[in-house]
Structures are given as structure tokens and as C-alpha cells.
Regions:
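Residue-level detector of intrinsically disordered/flexible regions characterized by low predicted structural confidence
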Residues: 8, 44, 793-802, 843
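N-terminal export and membrane-targeting signals
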Residues: 8-31
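Extracellular interaction modules
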Residues: 24, 769-772, 888-894
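Extracellular low-complexity, O-glycosylation-prone Ser/Thr/Pro/Gly-rich "stalks"
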Residues: 809-919
Length: 919
């Protein structure tokens, strides 16, 4: 993830000052010891059964930088991956998916979702360790920590460190900084950033001591002039590796190699188990050793160097081999015949055939990364692609992205560039130590892999495909869940966003025309949901417009015009019937359009930079909020009037939303610690607000389908309520709340976006900052929503009912059965209404498949329906089951809803269900 993208969602805790860290360090003894703080257990269970919810992700697959992949050296198929802001994962060989391991990280310790290093124990393979912390500057108020697990990451204990760590800082792809002694696995080493040196544990990571005799804490910063900023930190001690042959099992390994971010002194060694250290004589200078890998069979250390720590840059570098027996260094840098200059990273050894090594360019943006392979210890090299008459290239690989088809980034082939790219930011590149044919590597957006790597050596084609299934790493900026067939629309950092027709299926392509690298805000017309607008960061060379508009539910988009002075996306709102758009962009004031973005007029009465939203019922109403003041427009965004309401938060992360089906009903959440912070509701279009007393800290709020028997939408929020931080749902407009997540499912910072599903009661979508779009469903949906098994027992054949029915005709209520129909108008406005129909089976046998018919006595017209397949011809209406709600048990119900585009008129009085009259 880029640093800019991750700063956009403000941290939930006030940022600390740099002086806090210096004061803490001044209190430490020379050989500081860090004890386990309370040995806090953090289980990472697969489900939150006690809350009645199951949790998963909207399927995107990847979406962020994977800087580290680590294979266990003793157990096949035990593999871990680390991300810069989205936690760590373990590979599940049975499902071929990655399992998230750090979802227990919560709101207050959100920085622990950034993983700077991970280590898997080669002796006790159930043990795994993670060094966590996201920023070393004051963006992250908390110190870093070392987490340890004895059950492969299912549960964790945490030891806090007296300094910060930078999982999303420059140099994060170097490593691994954390390493387990392969002979005495109670011993671990950790290379720290920021000048804090080398640290050691002798009790399986429970306590840590600084290795005070280690001579060099590093001195390289990406930009030394950026003091206290993102680029200004000393990248420190960057990797540790062992020669396991230098000791017997149970003894401390004697030969230890350490990489340091110092271009003149980049590799150190101990030959006495860490008692003393020396700079290895004769080593190359002028570059940083990004990676160090030891071949213990032949006694050789390989290093891949670059002129920076990456991951975005690196214009020069070398590859060297060190012979531990003779002390000789040999330059084995592959020579690029095309004259490209780049650093090197992604260094790996084939442990089955240790003469085989591979390295990757760090970094080559155009035309693509280069991968080099040697089968003779670097004496000769071959590369994965080469020019065959410019602009054509000969590729040693083919590329299957069917697992995440959006990875082409909407780009066609533009020789010599091909789409998708082979990779970028590839600092993690690892050959399976048990299988020479298998390789996994990380990029800025995914994990790729191959299972036939050695075909390279015989002139064959290496088959590369997506291997990121289960990793969900996007940073969510906004979410919208329209009623109807489309389940969700996402606005994401780095990869733009998607229209999700099915949340269990990876979308084919991200937003296009215009393509936005990061989409900040998205909205749809509540009564005409096919009309949508989104705003995002323009990408140089693609299109200059920050706004995209669709009238077909996101199937296609066009770039809107921009008012003069626009410099960034801001926020956007679409009115209830899709006839107007209000846009509050960066760089200029609020504007409105009545032409779907082809022209704009400045709004008055509202400050520039205000956050805007639309009323979900009245197409003439828009709302805005800025600096503690609420504004309302009743003329389609032309003019806004300042509300007299006081006591609203003027600072912090403030979000608000209007309630579908309820005109003038607004919920506002946000604020800042040690200041005004909470949740407020208005039922008079913002004229007055009432604070919800139970909400201590409100951060984001959204709405979904009402609970059975209720007419008001379910309310969802990420907040602290009655002293407890979590994800909550209210089925009674905020009178009572139930926490629906648990401590094992917190997903760090969740303050950007939340929404319920308008068609499925209980379903909630949660935006995270690095764990993608989390989706929660009730374990057993009440009433019409049957629970679906995770894996159908017989996917090839439909399940037969206990008593076979005639497939060509749905079963009626039966001779002794009966039914009742409730038809209600649950909301209405000037030119429309919302209806809800409930079918009750009052008979003794189940109804399997239903078709309800009625005739409107007036000129009512239905514009949209949900939970049913509905058609209307003149006044005659036919509503059929939606498939999943086809069976109504005795005493059970099935409900569906619709929006009418006329006045509600007189309600129908006669209904037939499967041809039988129904009361």
C-alpha cells in the first residue's frame, strides 16, 4: 500500500508526539529487557458462534502489497505470508486458500495489523512469530510488538516493544528481520528499525534483550531530510539468517549473519553464537543488502543488494556470493544485455538443488520486472523474458489471472508491455524448500505462483497463476449496497473499486472510464439504483476527470465534466430519483448537476470541503456537514441552509447517512477522543439532533433490511457503546444495541464505511483498512432466510426432497391448507411509495414454490422489487419466489418488498397463492 492511501482514514487515537518515544527509551537500561505484558491471549477462531454471526470477506482476492512469504524449513506446505497493513496469513493446503491470523487486532491497537516480519519455527513447527506495528513516526501512536503463537496462529500472546515498528514504512520488503535459531528454537533474533539495533530472546519470544554488543544499528534513510516523516526513518537492522550446520540440535547456532541498512557496512557475522560480532571483511559497498540467504550445504552466503530499501524504487544493485570457508566474495550480478538498470531483491535458493538460485529486479516498472535464474551458483544466468526484435518480447512464462481477473487493471497489451504485468514491488520470491517446481511470489497487488518452475531449465513454459485466494488486503474508502441484483459497490484504495453482482465471486474488472487508482466516495439513487456516481483520484495518462457516472448499475461508466479548480475527489451524493448529483470536490466549492455530470452549477450557503449526502426519499433534499455544522438543501442542492443544531463534533472522523425509506431521517457519528465524540440522530432533516446516550464513541453508521416484523431499517455501526468497542446492530432505531462481532473478529480500524444489505436482514458489510470488505451474516436467517451450508454435500446434483414433488408445477397449499397475505404501505412520498407483502402459511403442510397474484384497484406501478421475481402487466401483478425463499414451512412466512412510482392508492384486497384464494 502506498503511504498516501493509508493516511486517508484517520487513526482512531490521537497521534502521539515523537518525544513520547524518546522519553520511554531514556528510561531503559543499556541491556533493556521487555517482559510479556500480561501474556494476553488472542484467539483467532474461524467463527463467532456466540454472537450468532459468521464472518468472511467479499471476494476480491488480494488487492495489496505482500512483502514477505516464509516457508517452514521442516514441514511441507506450512507457509506464511505477511502484508504491510492487513495482517498475516497461513496457507491451507487442503483448500488452497490463505487463512487470516490477526483479525483479533482491534481498534486501539490497529497498528498491529502491519506485519514487518514473520518467522516459523523449524524445530517446533506449531510455533510462529510476528513482528507487528505499522508506522515508526507519529502516524501510529502505539509501540510495536512481537506476537508469538504455539498453535500456528490460532491464538497469540503479545510482548510490547519499547519502540515502534514499520510494517508500512519504506524498506518493509527487506528481511526477514525476525528469525528462529534452527538448533535451539528458544532463541530468536529481531532486527529493529530507527536505530534500535539487534534484539534477542532466549525464551521463545516471551522477553527480549537488546544485543548491546552488536556494532551497527544502521544509518540509511530514504530521505534523511524528512525528519520525523515517512521517508526519514533509519531502516535499521533488516535481516537475520543462520548457518544451521554450525551447531548440533539443542545447541545455540554459532554462525549468524545479519544485514544492516548501511551502504558501507551491510553484512555482519558472529561465529560464537552472538557473543561477538564483526563486519565481514571484503564485502561489497555502495548498496544495501536487501536479502541474505545462506546455503548451508555448500557454506555459501548470497546477498541481493539495491541502492534503496524499496519497495517503490531501486535503480542499481548487485548480487554477491560469500564463501564462509575461504572468506572470498564473488560478484555474480547478472548482466542485463538490454541496458536496464535496477537493484536486486527477491533472492531465493532451491533447497533441493542449492546450486540453483533466483533473484528479481528491484525495481523495473517498464516494461516489466525481470526474474533471473542460475543453476550454477550464479556463474551463468537466464532470464524470464527477453526482447526478440523491439517491441516484441519472448516470454518463458504464461500468465493465468482467472483467479483474480481484474489484475489486468483494464489495460490492453501495449508492446513491449503485456497485461497483466508479471509483477512489481516483488521483494518476496520463494522456492518451496520441499518442491523445486513450486514458487510463490508477492507483488503490489497479489501473490502469484507456479508448480512447474524447473521446466524453465529445459526451455519449457512456466505456468504462473494467482495464489492469493483468501488474502483480502484492500483499504476500503466507501461502500454502497443498492437494492436488487447488485449486492455491493465498493470504493477502494489502490485498485479503484468494483461492482459486486455476487459477493462470493471475484469481479472481472475494476471501475473504468474513468479509471481511478483510489475511489474515495460512491453513491446511488435510492429509488432508481441503476444511477450511480463515484469520485476518485485521477491517474496521470488515463483521464483527467475525478468523477464517473453510470445509469446502468455500474455495467458501464463515463467520465463527467469537472467544475473549474477541482484538484481531488472529495465526496459525492446522488438524489433519490437520480435526477441530480451534488459534488463536494477538493480544490473548489460544492456544486450540483442536473445533467448527470455534463455541467455543474455552484451551490450556495455551504462551505467548500463539506461532506455531502442525499436524502433517500425526497429527491429535492441534500445534506452537508463541515466543522461541526449541519446544512440542508431543499432545492436539489442549489442552496443550503445552516442548521441551528449545536453540540455536533467539529473535529475527527465524522460520517453521516440518511435512512432509506424515511424522509429527513439522518444519523451522524464521529468525533475525537478528549473532545466531542458520539452519535446523533435527526428526524427533521437536520434542524435538530438528539444524541444517543449509549454511544460513547460513534464512528460510522449504515442501514440494512429491517428485522422481521419491523418497518425501520436495521442500524449498523462501528462504535464504542456502553464502554465496549465493536460492531453493533440495532433493530429498534437505536433504543437497544447488540454487539455482533467478538474479540476474535475486530479487523483493526473500521471507521471508514459500514452498510447493511437492503435485501437480506442481518447482513452487514464493513470497510477495513487493509482486510478488505468484511461481510457478516446471521448464522441462521430468521423467517424467510434459510441457512445455506458452506459446502453442499452433492454439488453435482440438486438435493432431493424427502417426498418428491412434481418439478413442473409448484405445490399448492393443499386441500386442508390455507394462507394469509399481509399487504402494507410502509412509507410514502410525493410521487412514490414503499410496499411490503408477507405470506403466512397457516396450513399443515409446507409450501414448496410459490406464486402470488393480485390486481391493483388503481393505477399503481411497481418500479423495483426485492426478495421476489415480480412482473406487472397493467394492473395485474405476479410475484414468484426468489429461489432461496421458495419453501414456506407450516406457520412460516415469506416477505418481499417493492417501490412504487405512483401514489399508493387503494390497497388490493384479493390475492391468490398458487391458484388458490388467500385471505
Amino acid at each position: 500500500m502506498t503511504p498516501t492511501d493509508q493516511r486517508a482514514p484517520l487513526p482512531p487515537i490521537p497521534r502521539s508526539r515523537r518525544g513520547v518515544l524518546s522519553r520511554a527509551l531514556s528510561c531503559l537500561a543499556t541491556a533493556a529487557t521487555v517482559a510479556a505484558l500480561g501474556a494476553v491471549l488472542h484467539p483467532a477462531a474461524p467463527a463467532a458462534a456466540d454472537t450468532g454471526y459468521t464472518w468472511g470477506n467479499v471476494e476480491i482476492v488480494g488487492g495489496g502489497f505482500v512483502p514477505g512469504i516464509v516457508f517452514n524449513q521442516s514441514e511441507p506446505d506450512l507457509i506464511y505470508a505477511r502484508t504491510d497493513i492487513g495482517g498475516a496469513y497461513r496457507w491451507n493446503p487442503d483448500t488452497e486458500r490463505w487463512i487470516p491470523l490477526l483479525d483479533h487486532v482491534g481498534w486501539d491497537d490497529w497498528g498491529h495489523s502491519g506485519v514487518v516480519s514473520i518467522a516459523t519455527d523449524p524445530v517446533d513447527t506449531d510455533r510462529v512469530y510476528a513482528a507487528v506495528g505499522t508506522y515508526t513516526n507519529d502516524w501510529d501512536p502505539n509501540n510495536g510488538a512481537i506476537k508469538r503463537s504455539t498453535d500456528r496462529g490460532r491464538t497469540w500472546q503479545t510482548t510490547e516493544l519499547p519502540f515502534k515498528l514499520g510494517g508500512n514504512m519504506p524498506g518493509r520488503g527487506m528481511g526477514e528481520r525476525l528469525a528462529v535459531d534452527p538448533n535451539d528454537n528458544s532463541v530468536l533474533y529481531f532486527g529493529a528499525p530507527s536505530g534500535h539495533g539487534l534484539w534477542k530472546s532466549t525464551d521463545h519470544g516471551a522477553t527480549w534483550n537488546e544485543v548491546t554488543n552488536f556494532p551497527n544499528p544502521g544509518n540509511y534513510a530514504a530521505d534523511p531530510s524528512d525528519v520525523g516523516g515517512y521517508q526519514g526513518d533509519n531502516q535499521g537492522v533488516v535481516w537475520v539468517t543462520f548457518d544451521p550446520s554450525s551447531a548440533s540440535p539443542g545447541q545455540v547456532t554459532q554462525d549468524i549473519y545479519v544485514g544492516v541498512a548501511d551502504k558501507d557496512n551491510t553484512v555482519y557475522r558472529s561465529t560464537d553464537g552472538g557473543a561477538t560480532w564483526e563486519r565481514i571483511p571484503g564485502q561489497p559497498t555502495g548498496f544495501l543488502a536487501q536479502k541474505g540467504v545462506f546455503d548451508h550445504v555448500n557454506g555459501l552466503l548470497y546477498i541481493a543488494t539495491s541502492d534503496t530499501g524499496g519497495p517503490y524504487d531501486g535503480s542499481d544493485g548487485e548480487v554477491w556470493r560469500y564463501d564462509a570457508a575461504t572468506g572470498a566474495w564473488t560478484d555474480i550480478t547478472p548482466a542485463d544485455p538490454d541496458g536496464f538498470e535496477y537493484g536486486f531483491s527477491g533472492l531465493t535458493i532451491d533447497r533441493q538443488n542449492p546450486d540453483t538460485i533466483m533473484v528479481v529486479s528491484q525495481i523495473l516498472w517498464w516494461p516489466d520486472i525481470q526474474v533471473w535464474r542460475s543453476t550454477d551458483r550464479g556463474a551463468t544466468w537466464s532470464r524470464i523474458w527477453e526482447f526478440s526484435g523491439y517491441p516484441n518480447r519472448t516470454l518463458r512464462y504464461d500468465h493465468d489471472i482467472s483467479g483474480a481477473p481484474w489484475l489486468h487493471f483494464n489495460n490492453p497489451d501495449r508492446p513491449p508491455e503485456v497485461s497483466p504485468k508479471l509483477g512489481w514491488m516483488t521483494q518476496a520470491f520463494e522456492i518451496d524448500p520441499f518442491d523445486s517446481d513450486r514458487v510463490l511470489y508477492g507483488t503490489g497487488a497479489t501473490v502469484y505462483g507456479s508448480d512447474n518452475l524447473t521446466d524453465w531449465d529445459s526451455g519449457g513454459t512456466v505456468h504462473i497463476k494467482v495464489r492469493a485466494q483468501g488474502i483480502e488486503e484492500t483499504a476500503v474508502q466507501d461502500l454502497a449496497a443498492p437494492p436488487g441484483a447488485t449486492e455491493l459497490v465498493s470504493a477502494l484504495g489502490d485498485i479503484g473499486g468494483f461492482v459486486h453482482e455476487d459477493i462470493d465471486v471475484v469481479p472481472d474488472a475494476m471501475f473504468d472510464t474513468p479509471f481511478h487508482g483510489t475511489t474515495r466516495s460512491i453513491d446511488f439513487a435510492e429509488l432508481a439504483p441503476a444511477t450511480m456516481a463515484r469520485v476518485g483520484e485521477a491517474v496521470s495518462g488515463e483521464v483527467d476527470s475525478h468523477i464517473g457516472i453510470s445509469t446502468d448499475g455500474g455495467s458501464s461508466w463515463w467520465a463527467g465534466q469537472q467544475p473549474p479548480g477541482v484538484t481531488g475527489p472529495g465526496t459525492v451524493a446522488v438524489n433519490a430519483d437520480g435526477s441530480r448529483i451534488v459534488w463536494s470536490p477538493d480544490g473548489t466549492g460544492v456544486h450540483y448537476s442536473t445533467t448527470l455530470g455534463s455541467s455543474w452549477t455552484a451551490s450556495t450557503g455551504v462551505p467548500a470541503g463539506a461532506r455531502v449526502e442525499a436524502d433517500r426519499v425526497d429527491p429535492d433534499k441534500f445534506y452537508a456537514f463541515a466543522n461541526g455544522t449541519f446544512y440542508t438543501s431543499t432545492d436539489g442542492g442549489a442552496t443550503f441552509t445552516e442548521s441551528a443544531a449545536t453540540g455536533l463534533p467539529a473535529r475527527g472522523n465524522v460520517r453521516f447517512a440518511a435512512v432509506p425509506g424515511h424522509e429527513g431521517d439522518i444519523w451522524l457519528a464521529g468525533g475525537e477522543a478528549n473532545s466531542t465524540y458520539g452519535m446523533w440522530r435527526s428526524t427533521d432533516s437536520g434542524a435538530t439532533f438528539t444524541r444517543l446516550g449509549d454511544v460513547d464513541e460513534g464512528d460510522v453508521v449504515g442501514f440494512g433490511k429491517p428485522a422481521p416484523g419491523k418497518s425501520y431499517p436495521a442500524v449498523y455501526t462501528s462504535s464504542k457503546i456502553n464502554g465496549v468497542r465493536g460492531i453493533f446492530r440495532s433493530d429498534d432505531a437505536g433504543q437497544t444495541w447488540v454487539r455482533i462481532n467478538d474479540d476474535q473478529h475486530q479487523w483493526a480500524w473500521t471507521g471508514a464505511a459500514i452498510t447493511g444489505d437492503p435485501d437480506v436482514y442481518g447482513r452487514v458489510y464493513i470497510g477495513t483498512n487493509g482486510r478488505g470488505v468484511v461481510v457478516g451474516d446471521l448464522t441462521g436467517q430468521p423467517g424467510e432466510e434459510p441457512e445455506e451450508p458452506e459446502e453442499p454435500e452433492e454439488p453435482e446434483e440438486p438435493e432431493e426432497p424427502e417426498e418428491p414433488e412434481e418439478p413442473e408445477e409448484p405445490e399448492g397449499p393443499g386441500e386442508d391448507a390455507s394462507c394469509a397475505v399481509s399487504y402494507q404501505v410502509v412509507n410514502q412520498w410525493g410521487n412514490g411509495f414503499q410496499g411490503e407483502v408477507t405470506i403466512t402459511n397457516t396450513g399443515d403442510s409446507a409450501i414448496s414454490g410459490w406464486e402470488l397474484k393480485w390486481t391493483f384497484p388503481g393505477d399503481q406501478q411497481i418500479a423495483h422489487a426485492w426478495n421476489t421475481q415480480l412482473t406487472q402487466t397493467g394492473a395485474d401483478v405476479t410475484a414468484r419466489d426468489a429461489g432461496w425463499n421458495s419453501t414456506i414451512a407450516p406457520g412460516g412466512t415469506a416477505s418481499f418488498g417493492f417501490l412504487g412510482s405512483t401514489a399508493p392508492g387503494t390497497a388490493p384486497s384479493e390475492f391468490t397463492l398458487n391458484g388458490e384464494s388467500c385471505s
